[in-house]
A protein has these predicted regions:
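Extracytosolic ligand-binding ectodomains
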Residues: 1-378
């Protein structure tokens, strides 16, 4: 049992690897929720919450499993906020979290395959499954009058799951996919992949990869050879580092990212920006919510015991109860202390399915004037 004067929560994200530019503010967003709870003095009668960071690497399942094992055995964390990428999240859930009875809430692992893992009630995610993102992105593409394209995806659980979902949805809407080309992350040269994509005859390409490695490499190589001039992106490609690091004009490039412009999203953005976090960056709201749910579950069960946390996540996430928004965690702790119920809405309108997944909405984004702009929420 975790000590009740200081409760540790693991934050395992890819601080190195193909989405490293996104993870620092994801972690800071989770830690913002922890600070809010610690400062309130209301968790289990005054416990403080501290974050223990660990590196998932995003792509190396062995390294991620070892890092998670250290969190659970040496650091004795009460629960885990993470991981980020789907393959390492699956490995951590199956190899470490579930066998040890540790609740794990991912803010960004979106592979449809995670819906079906035998998680014994310990795995949750505040980002929606890519089964839905594939459909939304296909609709966005169709609505823009694009009926033919090539697809490249990062060759892992995330990329394959999203590509299947997107391609099937696009074809069902009458679209034509001229090529599906997997790519590996961490390569120095992507000209072969770009040449295959281009040779398929498509003038548009969907890049379902990672913003700091393979996906960006595909885009850079496409710009250099003139193969493609704008790109269709999914969530793993959305980030300011793309605009900063690609040599060329990305105006008109568009894509999807889980998110909304709801009351909760705006409240989180205001709170985050006063703490030096953008607040509407990729998976920042989902990270705040994931950490918040862990702490509310601790309070609801009146215990930082690992098994108690898992049993209480659903109860605080869904109706019935008082709706709770970002910045209102103290209020939620007070209600739970008095035996009341909360329905945590948070920054992302949290509502879990019976397997602990967010349904979620998506922002359609487009690059213009050197930044990502929200076109609409779907």
């Amino acid at each position: 049992q975790a000590s009740t004067d200081e409760i540790k929560i693991g934050v395992i994200l890819g601080f190195t690897g193909p989405i490293e530019s996104l993870t620092t503010t994801m972690a800071s967003s989770a830690e913002l929720a922890m600070k809010e709870v610690s400062d309130s003095g209301l968790l289990l009668g005054g416990a403080s919450v501290s974050s223990v960071r660990a590196d998932s690497t995003c792509v190396d399942a062995g390294a991620a499993t070892s890092a998670a094992e250290r969190l659970v055995t040496s650091d004795n964390v009460a629960a885990i906020m993470g991981a980020d990428c789907s393959g390492v999240t699956t490995a951590i859930a199956n190899n470490v979290a579930v066998p040890n009875g540790v609740t794990i809430i991912s803010p960004s692992a979106t592979s449809p395959a995670l819906t079906d893992i035998d998680d014994k009630g310990y795995f949750f995610r505040t980002a929606p499954s890519d089964a839905r993102q594939g459909q939304v992105l296909a609709q966005v593409v169709m609505d823009r009058g694009i009926s033919e394209l090539a697809v490249t995806y990062t060759n892992n659980d995330y990329g394959k799951g999203l590509s299947d979902s997107f391609v099937n949805a696009f074809k069902a809407m009458g679209g034509t996919v001229t090529a599906e080309v997997p790519h590996e992350d961490g390569k120095g040269d992507y000209s072969a992949e770009v040449s295959t994509l281009s040779a398929s005859g498509a003038t548009e390409v969907a890049v379902l990869g990672y913003v700091d490695q393979g996906g960006r490499g595909i885009i850079q190589s496409s710009m250099e050879t003139g193969a493609f001039s704008r790109f269709i992106l999914a969530d793993g490609m959305i980030g300011d580092s793309l605009i900063e690091n690609v040599d060329g004009d990305l105006t008109g490039t568009f894509g999807t990212l889980p998110g909304s412009e709801s009351e909760g999203a705006n409240m989180f953005k205001a709170m985050a920006s006063s703490n030096g976090i953008p607040g509407d960056g990729p998976f920042e709201p989902e990270s705040y919510d994931a950490a918040a749910l862990i702490m509310l579950a601790i309070q609801a069960g009146n215990s930082a015991d690992r098994s108690s946390i898992a049993n209480n996540v659903m109860g605080v996430a869904n109706a019935p109860g008082t709706e709770i928004f970002p910045g209102e965690l103290g209020k939620a702790l007070e209600i739970l202390k008095d035996g009341g119920e909360v329905n945590y809405q948070g920054a992302t309108n949290v509502e879990f399915s019976d397997v602990g997944e967010a349904s979620g909405s998506y922002k359609e984004l487009e690059i213009g004037n050197g930044e990502f702009n929200t076109i609409q929420v779907r």
